[in-house]
Curated annotation (Swiss-Prot):
NCBIfam families: adk, PRK00279.1-1, PRK00279.1-2, PRK00279.1-3, PRK14527.1. PANTHER family: NUCLEOTIDE KINASE. CDD domains: ADK (cd01428). One of its GO terms (molecular function) is adenylate kinase activity. This is Adenylate kinase. SUPFAM superfamilies: P-loop containing nucleoside triphosphate hydrolases. It is found in: Cytoplasm. Belongs to the adenylate kinase family. One of its GO terms (biological process) is AMP salvage.
Protein backbone atom coordinates (compact mmCIF):
# COMPACT_ATOMS: atom_id res chain seq x y z
CA UNK A 1 0.00 0.00 0.00
CA UNK A 2 1.61 3.24 -1.21
CA UNK A 3 -0.32 6.36 -0.34
CA UNK A 4 -0.54 10.05 0.43
CA UNK A 5 -2.90 11.53 3.03
CA UNK A 6 -4.09 15.06 2.26
CA UNK A 7 -6.10 17.38 4.46
CA UNK A 8 -5.84 20.64 6.40
CA UNK A 9 -4.03 20.98 9.73
CA UNK A 10 -6.27 19.63 12.49
CA UNK A 11 -8.07 17.17 10.18
CA UNK A 12 -6.75 14.17 12.14
CA UNK A 13 -4.18 12.98 9.58
CA UNK A 14 -1.66 12.08 12.29
CA UNK A 15 -4.09 9.79 14.12
CA UNK A 16 -5.16 8.04 10.93
CA UNK A 17 -1.58 7.77 9.66
CA UNK A 18 -0.64 5.91 12.85
CA UNK A 19 -3.52 3.47 12.25
CA UNK A 20 -2.57 2.91 8.58
CA UNK A 21 1.13 2.34 9.20
CA UNK A 22 0.29 -0.27 11.84
CA UNK A 23 -2.49 -1.88 9.79
CA UNK A 24 -0.45 -2.27 6.60
CA UNK A 25 2.99 -2.67 8.20
CA UNK A 26 4.39 0.32 6.29
CA UNK A 27 6.56 3.25 7.40
CA UNK A 28 5.43 6.86 7.60
CA UNK A 29 7.77 8.86 5.37
CA UNK A 30 8.21 12.34 6.82
CA UNK A 31 10.58 14.61 4.92
CA UNK A 32 11.61 16.33 8.17
CA UNK A 33 12.60 13.02 9.82
CA UNK A 34 14.23 11.86 6.60
CA UNK A 35 16.36 15.00 6.35
CA UNK A 36 17.47 14.71 9.99
CA UNK A 37 18.35 11.00 9.55
CA UNK A 38 20.32 11.63 6.33
CA UNK A 39 22.26 14.50 7.93
CA UNK A 40 22.99 12.38 11.02
CA UNK A 41 24.09 9.39 8.91
CA UNK A 42 26.33 11.65 6.81
CA UNK A 43 25.03 10.32 3.47
CA UNK A 44 26.11 12.27 0.35
CA UNK A 45 22.63 13.82 0.03
CA UNK A 46 22.52 14.42 3.79
CA UNK A 47 25.81 16.33 3.67
CA UNK A 48 24.53 18.37 0.73
CA UNK A 49 21.31 19.18 2.61
CA UNK A 50 23.28 20.11 5.76
CA UNK A 51 25.36 22.58 3.76
CA UNK A 52 22.18 24.30 2.50
CA UNK A 53 20.50 24.31 5.94
CA UNK A 54 23.63 25.59 7.72
CA UNK A 55 23.65 28.51 5.28
CA UNK A 56 20.00 29.19 6.23
CA UNK A 57 18.68 28.10 2.83
CA UNK A 58 15.71 25.93 1.86
CA UNK A 59 16.46 22.40 0.70
CA UNK A 60 15.53 22.11 -3.00
CA UNK A 61 12.77 19.81 -4.26
CA UNK A 62 15.38 17.88 -6.29
CA UNK A 63 17.35 17.15 -3.15
CA UNK A 64 14.20 16.11 -1.26
CA UNK A 65 13.20 13.75 -4.10
CA UNK A 66 16.71 12.26 -4.00
CA UNK A 67 16.29 11.62 -0.28
CA UNK A 68 12.83 10.11 -0.87
CA UNK A 69 14.21 7.72 -3.50
CA UNK A 70 17.02 6.65 -1.14
CA UNK A 71 14.53 6.14 1.69
CA UNK A 72 12.19 4.00 -0.42
CA UNK A 73 14.97 1.51 -1.18
CA UNK A 74 15.12 0.53 2.51
CA UNK A 75 13.68 -2.89 3.49
CA UNK A 76 10.82 -1.47 5.60
CA UNK A 77 9.30 0.03 2.41
CA UNK A 78 8.88 -3.41 0.78
CA UNK A 79 5.11 -3.44 1.51
CA UNK A 80 4.60 0.24 0.75
CA UNK A 81 4.81 3.62 2.45
CA UNK A 82 2.73 6.55 3.62
CA UNK A 83 3.86 10.09 2.82
CA UNK A 84 3.41 12.48 5.72
CA UNK A 85 3.39 16.20 4.91
CA UNK A 86 4.77 15.60 1.43
CA UNK A 87 4.26 16.68 -1.27
CA UNK A 88 3.14 20.13 -0.11
CA UNK A 89 3.25 21.91 -3.47
CA UNK A 90 2.52 21.22 -7.15
CA UNK A 91 6.25 21.34 -8.11
CA UNK A 92 6.94 18.66 -5.46
CA UNK A 93 4.06 16.52 -6.78
CA UNK A 94 5.41 16.93 -10.33
CA UNK A 95 8.90 15.94 -9.17
CA UNK A 96 7.48 12.86 -7.41
CA UNK A 97 5.65 11.87 -10.60
CA UNK A 98 8.70 12.49 -12.83
CA UNK A 99 10.82 10.33 -10.53
CA UNK A 100 8.40 7.45 -11.16
CA UNK A 101 7.59 7.01 -7.45
CA UNK A 102 4.53 4.75 -7.41
CA UNK A 103 1.30 5.58 -5.57
CA UNK A 104 -1.77 3.39 -5.10
CA UNK A 105 -4.04 5.90 -3.36
CA UNK A 106 -4.30 9.57 -2.50
CA UNK A 107 -6.83 10.11 0.30
CA UNK A 108 -8.24 13.51 1.22
CA UNK A 109 -9.64 13.91 4.73
CA UNK A 110 -12.18 16.70 4.51
CA UNK A 111 -13.20 18.75 7.57
CA UNK A 112 -15.07 22.09 7.48
CA UNK A 113 -12.92 25.06 8.48
CA UNK A 114 -15.23 25.99 11.38
CA UNK A 115 -14.79 22.50 12.88
CA UNK A 116 -11.00 22.73 12.62
CA UNK A 117 -10.94 26.12 14.33
CA UNK A 118 -13.11 24.75 17.15
CA UNK A 119 -10.99 21.58 17.47
CA UNK A 120 -7.66 23.38 17.59
CA UNK A 121 -8.47 26.61 19.42
CA UNK A 122 -10.25 24.64 22.17
CA UNK A 123 -7.15 22.66 23.15
CA UNK A 124 -5.61 23.31 26.57
CA UNK A 125 -2.52 21.73 28.11
CA UNK A 126 -0.92 21.30 31.52
CA UNK A 127 2.67 22.27 30.68
CA UNK A 128 4.43 20.29 33.43
CA UNK A 129 2.81 16.91 32.67
CA UNK A 130 1.75 17.31 29.04
CA UNK A 131 -1.84 16.34 29.95
CA UNK A 132 -4.19 17.74 27.36
CA UNK A 133 -7.82 18.79 27.48
CA UNK A 134 -10.40 20.39 25.23
CA UNK A 135 -12.85 23.01 26.44
CA UNK A 136 -15.73 21.25 24.67
CA UNK A 137 -14.78 17.65 23.88
CA UNK A 138 -12.63 16.74 26.91
CA UNK A 139 -13.00 19.48 29.55
CA UNK A 140 -11.16 19.41 32.89
CA UNK A 141 -13.28 18.78 36.02
CA UNK A 142 -12.85 22.41 37.04
CA UNK A 143 -12.66 25.05 34.33
CA UNK A 144 -9.14 26.12 33.38
CA UNK A 145 -7.22 23.88 35.79
CA UNK A 146 -5.51 20.48 35.62
CA UNK A 147 -7.50 17.57 37.12
CA UNK A 148 -4.51 16.16 39.04
CA UNK A 149 -2.59 19.18 40.32
CA UNK A 150 -5.16 21.99 40.14
CA UNK A 151 -2.54 24.08 38.31
CA UNK A 152 -3.66 26.41 35.50
CA UNK A 153 -3.98 25.10 31.95
CA UNK A 154 -2.56 27.05 29.03
CA UNK A 155 -3.40 27.46 25.36
CA UNK A 156 -0.34 26.87 23.17
CA UNK A 157 0.52 29.61 20.70
CA UNK A 158 -0.03 27.10 17.86
CA UNK A 159 -3.63 26.62 18.99
CA UNK A 160 -4.63 30.29 19.13
CA UNK A 161 -7.42 31.07 16.69
CA UNK A 162 -5.42 33.62 14.66
CA UNK A 163 -2.55 31.09 14.28
CA UNK A 164 -4.98 28.35 13.23
CA UNK A 165 -6.57 30.67 10.65
CA UNK A 166 -3.12 31.56 9.29
CA UNK A 167 -2.17 27.87 8.95
CA UNK A 168 -5.46 27.18 7.16
CA UNK A 169 -4.75 30.04 4.73
CA UNK A 170 -1.29 28.62 3.98
CA UNK A 171 -2.89 25.21 3.39
CA UNK A 172 -5.55 26.66 1.05
CA UNK A 173 -2.96 28.54 -1.02
CA UNK A 174 -0.13 26.01 -1.07
CA UNK A 175 -1.38 22.48 -0.47
CA UNK A 176 -5.08 22.56 -1.38
CA UNK A 177 -4.22 22.72 -5.15
CA UNK A 178 -2.87 19.15 -4.75
CA UNK A 179 -6.47 17.99 -4.31
CA UNK A 180 -7.26 19.10 -7.88
CA UNK A 181 -3.89 17.82 -9.13
CA UNK A 182 -4.39 14.27 -7.85
CA UNK A 183 -8.13 14.02 -8.51
CA UNK A 184 -7.58 15.10 -12.15
CA UNK A 185 -4.72 12.62 -12.55
CA UNK A 186 -6.85 9.82 -11.08
CA UNK A 187 -9.65 10.59 -13.57
CA UNK A 188 -7.23 10.59 -16.52
CA UNK A 189 -6.95 6.77 -16.46
CA UNK A 190 -3.20 7.09 -17.02
CA UNK A 191 -1.39 3.82 -16.27
CA UNK A 192 0.51 5.13 -13.22
CA UNK A 193 -2.36 7.22 -11.83
CA UNK A 194 -3.28 6.55 -8.19
CA UNK A 195 -6.90 6.16 -7.09
CA UNK A 196 -8.27 9.30 -5.44
CA UNK A 197 -10.62 9.01 -2.45
CA UNK A 198 -12.26 11.70 -0.34
CA UNK A 199 -13.62 10.93 3.14
CA UNK A 200 -15.23 13.05 5.84
CA UNK A 201 -12.99 13.66 8.84
CA UNK A 202 -15.95 14.58 11.07
CA UNK A 203 -16.91 12.03 13.73
CA UNK A 204 -15.16 9.73 16.19
CA UNK A 205 -11.67 8.36 15.52
CA UNK A 206 -13.17 4.89 14.96
CA UNK A 207 -15.79 6.19 12.50
CA UNK A 208 -13.10 7.90 10.44
CA UNK A 209 -10.89 4.80 10.64
CA UNK A 210 -13.77 2.73 9.27
CA UNK A 211 -14.39 5.20 6.39
CA UNK A 212 -10.69 5.13 5.57
CA UNK A 213 -10.54 1.32 5.52
CA UNK A 214 -13.56 1.19 3.17
CA UNK A 215 -12.05 3.85 0.87
CA UNK A 216 -8.84 1.83 0.55
CA UNK A 217 -10.75 -1.29 -0.45
CA UNK A 218 -12.74 0.37 -3.22
Amino acid sequence: MRLILLGPPGAGKGTQAAFLTQHYGIPQISTGNMLRAAVKAGTPLGLEAKKVMDAGGLVSDDLIIGLVRDRLTQPDCANGYLFDGFPRTIPQADALKSAGIALDYVVEIEVPESDIIERMSGRRVHPASGRSYHVRFNPPKAEGVDDVTGEPLVQRDDDREETVRHRLNVYQNQTRPLVDYYSSWAQSDAAAAPKYRKISGVGSVDEIKSRLSQALQS
